[in-house]
From Swiss-Prot:
Key enzyme in the regulation of glycerol uptake and metabolism. Catalyzes the phosphorylation of glycerol to yield sn-glycerol 3-phosphate. Keywords: ATP-binding, Glycerol metabolism, Kinase, Nucleotide-binding, Transferase. The gene is glpK. ADP binds at residues 15, 19, 273, 317, 419. Its EC number is 2.7.1.30. GO terms for molecular function: ATP binding; glycerol kinase activity. The keyword ATP-binding applies. Inhibited by fructose 1,6-bisphosphate (FBP). It catalyses: glycerol + ATP = sn-glycerol 3-phosphate + ADP + H(+). This is Glycerol kinase. InterPro entries: ATPase_NBD, Carb_kinase_FGGY, Carb_kinase_FGGY_CS, FGGY_C, FGGY_N, Glycerol_kin.
Length: 508
């Protein structure tokens, strides 16, 4: 092992696990360590995590990855951090102890407060204009307000000026730097409902609306700023290296950067349990006419912020899981391509709308429910599997169309990542139905790579994104092979099917 050699470490703190990956100059993964942590569900719709457990698990993976790579802290050029967004921690700055569990992004306990605020059209429009977001329990502000109102210890610490608040990146940086730095980056700040994306600062008006004192919030920095140095003893008892934290971004924004969607109109879609699609819209703030979110993608030092439009599909890979676990149609999701190809032999127009929990963008109908259309006497399991894969692509296509319309131009290609990318049938159908090119990178760890890229570029470990483009490479490309008549016919059928599922749960 060359002791002069330098590496980049990326910490990836997800919703259910923490990972650390060590990258070298050629973007090889030298070592990886991952551990899960606990989720708590104290009441229906409540989701919590233990901030001290998150910290100890993340620290353990950081040490483990370094040891597996057989390197010293002196060999680490910089560290990047990416994290689950919106999840919030409040803690005592004197002893580093949280005053309550972390309230997770999925947590719905503040739904009634959000409903109440949304009844005031002026407030609703002000918040949308200044944050790019709707007032929703998903985002951080009402979670902080809930803790301040319901946890006596939080009120006591606030009165004594000992209280700090932050998203998970802020909590980890505070711990890593030995309590020296209380900071966040623009991408994480933009998910709190307290950060004004028109001025790129915390907003007193937003603080007043949500009853959150700005004094407890971290300093907001560009995504590749110097967020402080890691205390050497966090690596090992004998470590001496002062390793800088030089890249921070929320997970979806990190994936957009990791996919090198650095020019306007570049789109990435993560095909996971659901789909997260983000489009780079450049330095000009734009608001969606289709209820997509406007968010800060990132900001590099001495440059203007880059904004993004974000849309999500609630059920993507989860629909394949439903086929496997609830209907027992197949043993594993890996079989889906086999069945889809089998179904192509006898053409049946089965359409499945997997609206298990309503439909997200661009429909925004919480009372839509799932339905399967076009079933005949000879419909078999393979037709259902094929329809499920196609449903994932149809839903993503609805987002693509919404984004193209907001941008006023067509989208020529999307970069894909996530588990469901393994389905060649899905990726080909996506290219066909959206009439564009789908590109899958060689390294699908795009979220972690985004954090690594930000940190590495900040310390000149890599020269620029052009160099990174050469290093990332393309694993697969899918181009449209469907003629326009067939595409229109299939799209028309999908649109009709969706229409028939809307408002289902609200029927008397």
């Amino acid at each position: 092992m060359d002791l002069k050699q330098q590496y980049i470490l990326a910490l990836d703190e997800g919703t259910s696990s923490c990972r650390t990956i060590v990258f070298d100059k050629d973007l090889n993964q030298v070592a990886i360590a991952q551990n899960e942590f606990n989720q708590f569900f104290p009441k229906s719709g409540w989701v919590e995590q233990d901030p001290l457990e998150i910290w100890s698990v993340q620290l353990a993976t950081m040490q483990s990855a370094k040891n597996k790579a057989q390197i010293k802290s002196n060999n680490i050029a910089a560290v990047g951090i990416t994290n689950q967004r919106e999840t919030i921690v409040l803690w005592n700055k004197e002893n580093g102890l949280p005053v309550y569990n972390a309230i997770v992004w999925q947590d719905q306990r503040t739904a009634s407060l959000c409903d109440k605020l949304n009844q005031d059209t002026k407030i609703k429009e002000f918040v949308k204009k200044h944050t790019g977001l709707p007032i929703n329990p998903y985002f951080s502000a009402t979670k902080i307000a809930w803790i301040l109102e319901n946890v006596p210890l939080a009120q006591k610490m606030l009165k004594e000026d000992k209280l700090l608040a932050g998203t998970i990146d802020t909590w980890l940086i505070w711990k890593l730097t030995g309590g020296k730095m209380h900071v966040t980056d623009v991408s994480n700040a933009s998910r709190t409902l307290l950060f004004d994306i028109t001025t790129m600062t915390w907003s007193q008006e937003l603080g007043d609306i949500f009853k959150v004192p700005l004094s407890i919030l971290p300093k907001v920095m560009p995504s590749n700023a110097h967020f402080g140095d890691i205390v050497p003893s966090h690596w090992s008892t004998s470590a001496t290296g002062m390793v800088p934290i030089r890249g921070v971004a929320g997970d979806q924004q990190a994936a957009l950067f990791g996919q090198l969607c650095v020019e306007p109109a570049m789109v990435k879609n993560t095909y996971g349990t659901g789909c997260f699609m983000l489009m780079n819209i450049g330095n000009e703030l734009k608001y969606s006419q289709h209820n997509l979110l406007t968010t800060v993608a990132w900001q590099l030092e001495n440059q203007k912020p880059v904004y993004a439009l974000e849309g999500s599909v609630f059920v993507a890979g989860a629909a394949l899981k439903w086929l496997r676990d609830s209907l027992k149609v197949m043993y594993s999701a890996a079989e889906s391509d086999f069945y889809a190809k089998l179904a192509q032999k006898e053409e049946q127009e089965v359409v499945f709308v997997p609206a298990f929990t309503g439909l997200g963008a661009p429909y925004w109908d919480a009372s839509a429910r799932g339905a399967i259309f076009g079933i005949e006497a000879n419909t078999k399991r393979e037709h259902l599997v094929k329809a499920t894969l196609e449903a994932i692509a149809f839903q993503a296509n609805d987002l693509i169309k919404a984004m193209a319309s907001d941008l006023n131009s067509s989208i020529k290609k999307i970069k894909a990542d996530g588990g469901a990318c393994n389905s060649n049938y899905l990726m080909q159908f996506q290219a066909d139905i959206a009439n564009l090119e789908v590109i899958i990178p060689k390294n699908v760890e795009t979220t972690t790579m985004g954090a690594a890229f930000l940190a590495g570029l900040a310390v000149n470990y890599w020269k620029d994104t052009k160099q990174l483009e050469k290093l990332t490479g393309i694993a697969k490309q899918f181009k449209s092979q469907m003629n326009q008549t067939v595409r229109e016919k299939k799209s028309k059928r999908w649109n009709e099917a969706v229409k028939r599922t809307l408002k289902w749960a609200s029927l008397d």
